[in-house]
A protein has these predicted regions:
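Anionic coordination/interaction segments
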Residues: 1-357, 372-380, 384, 416-421, ...
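Secondary-structure capping and boundary motifs in well-ordered enzyme cores
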Residues: 123, 139-141, 270, 329, ...
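Aromatic-rich carbohydrate-recognition surfaces in CAZymes
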Residues: 85-87, 366-462, 484-492, 621-643, ...
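Carbohydrate-binding/catalytic loop surfaces
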Residues: 361, 390-409, 434-436, 459-483, ...
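Catalytic cores of carbohydrate-active enzymes
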Residues: 164, 179, 392, 490-607, ...
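Beta-rich accessory regions
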Residues: 138-164, 211-213, 217-227, 269, ...
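Active-site acid/base region of carbohydrate-active enzymes
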Residues: 322-336, 357, 381, 386, ...
Length: 782
């Protein structure tokens, strides 16, 4: 879940927020998402970042910025607010480019969220203002602002710009840390410098890179570092004193509430324009500012080598896989935004916290475009596994709460890496454990399953300890005996995957052992976890079922029904009944709920989940991750139309959802029908482990261009609505133009024939990998 300092959520209409459903529009071939209002139905979020710097923006260009130090410290540079005021020096009238916080009526407004950049355009009172923010494709911890004003009228205008950027540069838990802070203007660097250096000289404390700055490409007319001097007494950001007076006071700030405010005056003849560039960033010391300003404060909106390099880098993120289907919304997600969202997950995960299962699953999706970066993170995950096989819950910072599922996620992620690259030598890499000793990657994977095999309860199911995938099942295993059905199913899937890996590298005895483990666990699940119409969620310390018809609330859970298929556990008749139960009890109309009915009162043997507000988070929300698992289960079973219906229901742009959410990125979930006041509103854009699963479901199972340990195979599962589709895929250095014909418009039709460059090809064989380029024609059965 989000921490308390992330982007501001829009206020629901019943509490005074906007009730207008402002539509979104794709531009620039799907690479920009545009909205023509600063007040959408639900706040839009865009993440722009590089490995060391993250800026989180809403549709007004507001949002915080963070710096990841070389030591892994996640330090906040900018607070939530970032405003640019535009003032007419003659009339005293002013507006804010991002609409907030002045909220003055505009003539035209547009926000365009791009890949690692964002542009806001605002035409108010005859002034066209353009404000672009981007983070360069480098490791420099900076963001660049380009601001241009154009006089659209027939009279000369004397205009003023005022920036407003609160910059506490906090992030370390120091006793009275603010007492060491100073913010002042450095004329040589043309920068406001927020300095937190003093603690590094204290005994045992060293905090390099904990300083921030706001720099400009010219000498400002004035500046302020004191928030109090900018706002003034008994005022707010809606009517700041410095802006109303049209003059900064050149104030320093000692200790409390530093702000980056600079004043720029522009004289604009009719039709004329002027442009200024700012840069915000983190630095180790003042001299570093000068090197960064020399590097970055020379470009403009029209000509900027760093912005050009950014566009080139973003294009490379999706070059190995492009799809074309009759569904343009799906195409935009798969071709542009899902690769970007996966990349964000690999680099920043959850705002800098490296959740173990989160980053591993992101790597599972990243191997197509960034196999080396994915492997680097997977090896880090190995290094955060204990010798016993238990994996940490996360790092940055270290979280060792005993969530039992962490390390088993490595099995499927490494499988995807091996299938994509064919780099089986990686299994022999030696990686240290987090506590003691070291082992090969293969042994790390084996230990993850051995840990689960040993941690079993009275029903031979896996012990849940503090929680499994569902973080909030904290009451199931208070006394150390509670068992998780989902984790037992995940163990089954991991056993089968590792068996395939072991067999591929000649470890046939291991493969047989893993398959035996799967069979034993599947038998235990079918014996103890079937409730008559669905699989239960868990058994508590005393063997009482959770997620059962006999429970008052939380009778049925989603994940156990999907993972019964993914772990190859469910018999045919039980699958049919289980799926019917899902449709009967969990369908919201715009995605499947995680459980039902929602908990409305605390249940001791369930724990935190039962105290979460109904419809939120894990308590009966439409959780995207859970829907992704079911989507894969449906595709594995060949249920193409049902899968496509589920995709359309849960995808973020579904117009049937009560709240119109941004359509370009997946949310963690949506408040469910039982929510008191936010039904259908997206929870936490960008930060979800569902993206690689959704991406893989569409590209490898629906379109069927699937990597395996033996190579690339074609096994589509197209919905009946699609007569054709195509995939451009680069795999192990070979390029394939794959064209799929479903002339009979048959759901889930099997492959009838394949030709490669016009010659017939065996439909059961992997495609040839020879470093060349090939046209692959796939005809499905009519």
């Amino acid at each position: 879940m989000a921490d308390s300092g992330t982007l501001t959520e829009i206020i629901p209409a019943e509490f005074g927020g906007s009730a207008e459903k402002v539509p979104f529009e794709y531009k620039a071939n799907g690479k920009e998402l545009s909205i023509a209002s600063p007040e959408p139905d639900r706040t839009m979020h865009n993440m722009i970042y590089n490995p060391n710097y993250l800026t989180m923006l809403d549709q007004s260009n507001c949002g915080m910025a963070r710096h990841m130090s070389p030591a892994g410290r996640n330090c906040r540079i900018v607070q939530n607010e970032r405003f640019i005021y535009v003032r007419d020096a003659d009339s005293g009238e002013y507006f804010s480019i991002g609409f907030a916080p002045v909220y003055k009526d505009y003539e035209r407004y547009e926000c365009r969220a791009g890949l690692n950049y964002q542009v806001v355009e605002n035409v108010t009172d005859g002034i066209e203002a353009v404000w672009r923010i981007y983070v360069p494709a480098s490791e420099d911890p900076v963001e660049i602002w380009d601001v241009r004003l154009r006089n659209t009228g027939d009279k000369a205008r004397n205009m003023q710009l005022f920036t407003y950027v609160p910059m506490n540069c906090d992030g370390e838990d120091l006793y009275c840390g603010e007492l060491h802070r100073i913010a002042e203007y450095l004329s040589e660097q043309r920068a406001l410098f927020i300095c937190m250096d003093a603690p590094r000289y204290l005994e045992g404390v060293d905090l390099p890179w904990h300083n921030g700055f706001l720099a400009i490409d010219r000498e400002p007319k004035g500046w302020d570092a004191s928030l109090g001097s900018v706002i003034g007494p008994r005022r707010t950001t809606q009517n700041p004193l410095a802006v109303e007076q049209g003059k900064c006071s050149n104030s320093k700030c000692a200790m409390f509430s530093p702000v980056g405010t600079m004043q720029v005056d522009m004289a604009l003849a009719p039709g004329a324009q002027d442009e200024v560039r700012f840069m915000i960033g983190a630095c180790d010391a003042a001299p570093m500012i000068e090197s960064l300003t020399t590097k970055y404060l020379t470009g403009s909106l029209e000509a900027d080598v760093h912005f050009d390099a950014l566009i080139e880098a973003e294009t490379a993120l999706s070059q190995n896989l492009q799809v074309k289907t009759p569904d343009e919304a799906l195409n935009n997600m798969v071709n542009v935004w899902s690769p970007k969202q996966i990349d964000y997950g690999v680099v920043w995960t959850r705002w800098g916290f490296k959740g173990y299962r989160d980053i591993i699953q992101q790597c599972q999706g990243a191997v197509i475009q960034q196999s080396e970066a994915a492997l680097e993170q997977l090896l880090k995950a190995c290094a955060h596994q204990y010798e016993s096989g238990f994996g940490l819950r996360g790092w940055h910072p270290i979280d060792d709460l005993r969530y039992a599922d962490s390390s088993q996620w490595m099995v499927s992620a490494f499988h995807e890496y091996l299938a994509e690259t064919g780099d089986f030598d990686t299994l022999e890499k030696v990686v240290p454990f987090f506590d003691n000793g070291e082992a090969t990657v293969y042994e790390h994977l084996r230990r993850s399953l051995l840990r689960l095999r040993e941690d079993r309860g009275a029903h031979n199911l896996n012990l849940v300890f503090y929680g499994d995938w569902n973080d909030s099942l904290t009451g199931v295993c208070r006394e150390g005996r509670g068992e998780s059905v989902w984790l037992s199913m995940a163990f089954c899937r991991s056993c089968l995957i590792l068996a395939n890996i072991a067999e591929k590298v000649g470890k046939t005895q291991d493969a047989e052992e893993y398959r035996l483990w799967q069979q034993e666990m599947a038998e235990a699940i079918n014996t103890h976890a079937w409730d008559g119409e669905w699989y239960i969620c868990a058994l508590d310390d005393d063997g009482n079922p959770i997620g059962s018809e006999q429970n008052e609330e939380g009778k049925i859970f989603l994940n156990m029904q999907s993972w019964a298929q993914l772990g190859k556990i469910v018999p045919e008749n039980r699958w049919e009944q289980s799926w019917k139960s899902v449709c009967d009890h969990l369908d919201s109309g715009w995605g499947l709920m995680l459980n039902s009915p929602a908990y409305t009162k605390y249940v001791h043997n369930v724990g935190r989940l039962s105290s979460i507000r109904p419809g939120a988070a894990e308590n009966a929300s439409v959780y995207t991750h859970g829907n992704a698992f079911m989507l894969l289960a449906l595709l594995e079973r060949g249920m193409a139309d049902e899968a496509y219906e589920l995709w359309n229901a849960v995808q973020p742009g579904n117009p049937e959802r009560p709240v119109l959410n941004q359509p370009n990125v997946f949310f963690n979930g949506y408040y469910g029908p039982s929510s008191e006041n936010r039904v259908g509103m997206g929870e936490h854009a960008w930060t979800t482990g569902s993206v690689p699963w959704m991406y893989q479901c569409v590209t490898e199972y629906m379109l069927g261009v699937r990597r395996t340990l033996d190579g690339l195979v074609i096994k589509p599962c197209l919905p009946s609505a699609w007569e054709n589709a195509s995939v451009q895929r680069t795999f192990r250095g070979t390029s394939f133009d794959i064209r799929i014909s479903n002339a009979g418009k048959k759901a889930g039709a099997a492959v009838a024939s394949i030709t490669i460059d016009g010659a017939a090809y065996d439909v059961t064989k992997p495609l040839p990998v020879d470093g060349g380029s090939h046209v692959v024609e796939v005809t499905l059965e009519a």
